[in-house]
UniProtKB/Swiss-Prot annotation:
Organism: Meyerozyma guilliermondii (strain ATCC 6260 / CBS 566 / DSM 6381 / JCM 1539 / NBRC 10279 / NRRL Y-324)
InterPro entries tied to this protein: DEAD/DEAH_box_helicase_dom, Helicase_ATP-bd, Helicase_C-like, P-loop_NTPase, RNA_helicase_DEAD_Q_motif
Identification of the protein by name: ATP-dependent RNA helicase SUB2
Function noted in UniProt: ATP-binding RNA helicase involved in transcription elongation and required for the export of mRNA out of the nucleus. SUB2 also plays a role in pre-mRNA splicing and spliceosome assembly. May be involved in rDNA and telomeric silencing, and maintenance of genome integrity.
Highest rank taxon of the organism: Eukaryota
Similarity-based family: Belongs to the DEAD box helicase family. DECD subfamily.
Residues that hold ATP according to the record: 92-99
Gene: SUB2
Pfam family, one: DEAD
GO biological process: mRNA processing; mRNA transport; RNA splicing
Residue ranges occupied by any Helicase C-terminal domain in the UniProt entry: 266-427
Reactions catalysed: ATP + H2O = ADP + phosphate + H(+)
Compositional bias (Acidic residues): 1-17
Subcellular location: Nucleus
Amino acid sequence: MSAEGQEELLDYSDSEEIAVPSNAPEAGADGADKDADKKGSYVGIHATGFRDFLLKPELLRAIGDCGFEHPSEVQQVCIPQSILGTDVLCQAKSGLGKTAVFVLSTLQQLDPVPGEITTLVICHTRELAYQIRNEYARFSKYMPDVKTEVFYGGIPIAKDIEKLKNKDTCPHIVVATPGRLHALVEEKAIRLNNVKSFVIDECDKVLEAIDMRRDVQDIFRNTPHQKQVMMFSATLSQEIRPVCKKFMQNPLEIYVDDEAKLTLHGLQQYYLKLDEKEKNRKLADLLDSLEFNQVIIFVKSTSRANELNKLLVASNFPSIAVHSAMPQEERIARYKSFKEFNKRICVSTDVFGRGIDIERINLAINYDLPNEADQYLHRVGRAGRFGTKGLAISFVGSKEDEEVLEKIQSRFDVKITEFPEEGVDSSTYMNT
């Protein structure tokens, strides 16, 4: 089976339909680590509080510790239905709190029994799985009996099997990539007969890849017929929606900014036309002249990531590279190092292009433009998340790049202007 390899590449009707207004606030309990004393400043349109959802006291206490007071618009629409066990299909742009919808909903419904797995969360990369596990840890901090484990390829499967067969270490919540989870099912090492919640995050990426979809179908068949199914993504094409709904029964469908505008709150977007040979000098100039907390620089291949990172380090820039060709443990260690602010600059392939939440990133640079417009959304969405400001700059070095830039502007009805010669005022993209 090659789904693990697919992850490595990473360039890989009676339902109720609700269109949430595109001016929804960009905050709420989402997937980034926030200091406990830092209060979320964005308020939902209806000023609903999390207490209105009648969540468990333990959950409300954890939400309060994170500094969240009001749910985002997506959370206001989804959570009241999802905590009742309704199937959910949700598409909303980055930073609107989709992760917290399924984390809070599944924890609300969870009644932990030793040795029984009741919640299954599938995602397409190891970093995202690791991050979701951390979200469960944050929101279940006052639920000491709840155990969550993450399973992904690149480490010996024997360790996973050992955890699963011991009632004391077997988790109630499993977060996993499709390849490793399918392997555990094939080995009969994991029992899914008690699963009550089946979640796929970034579901379009999981279900568009044929190998991953087959794995998910096999896993799905090993779970009970009666269960809740929830799927989430920042992009859901008209073609993939029917595929998602085949797993569901009369789902609540939420489409925010339905294939329309790229309106990432507070994100300034520019492009720079230059030749390939000019990219390194211009990048160094930008890193010297721009103010930023952390920056992520996207390139199109692992070899370019390594070479650019070497160049930056040699030029005394605090840089680190993260890409899918690295050994698994090193990749996770580098991700953690960047997230914990040990490095301010990260050079990455699209392994960081979807779902990864690092709150301090407020500058995203496309050293190489992506091939697809949707991938641009996921990349630049790393900056300006959670109601913060941000800046995105794309290098345009070829006719093909110009065509992609046109597609991005057309696809999302957004005007991306040329980066001014005099630069930009830091107050437009830096939080004061």
